[in-house]
Amino acid sequence: MDEIMNKELALVEVDSISDALSTFIEQGTETVINVFTSNEAAVIWEAVTEVSADLVKASKVVTVIKKAASIPDKLFMNKMEKYCRGLIEIPANKRKKYAAKVGKPGLNKDSVFILGVLNKIEELSKIKILLTLFEAKIDGLIDDETYRRLMLLVDRTMYSDLLYLKANITDEPIVIENDAEQGLLANGWLYYYGQTWGTATEDSQLVYHYTNIAKQFCQLIEIE
């Protein structure tokens, strides 16, 4: 059994997983996701005729990796599965139109970046946010640079701090008063604005503003 698995793993190239995600972005459906997350996916695919050869290949790559995965790899595959399940909620015609626009190289570039972020995030709750940002990019609401910047900001910010950001975003200057605001400042959602005048009874205080990208994030994202 180990010998068979080693031979299967030898067929999985370094970029196979990004190719698989690119295929799911373009062609993924609920049936596809249910099959590729099954332990018997490679067998089930043999009886499925209404999917493309690319999808069959993508599913088998994922299946092989899942079988041989270490615990950290299994955690990563769990994040990828959750991402793919959310991905199919984006209308298929929208995904296919985007795929046609950027081509396979563009999809692969997206996939490599997404996988890098998924590999680092520790809170599964963030995955819904990542999907919302990807759909916003597909819809042309944000450009690629803004999309990537927001993805990286989300990656390094605690989910509870993102909840705080959404609930407390303001155009007014603020004084840092709690750990959430300190976290948002440290991770680039706030910038230094100036200092208040001190009085006989009160010391001067440093004040900060939410960044434009923080405001843009809050316009795009619904967090429950």
What are these regions (language model features)?
Residues 6-83:
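Membrane-inserting effector segments that mediate pore formation, membrane fusion
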Residues 26, 30, 37, 57, ...:
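Generic surface-pattern signal
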Residues 107-224:
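Long, helix-rich, hydrophobic modules that act as membrane-proximal anchors or helical bundle/coiled-coil regulators
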Residues 6, 15-22, 34, 39, ...:
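Detector for Asparagine
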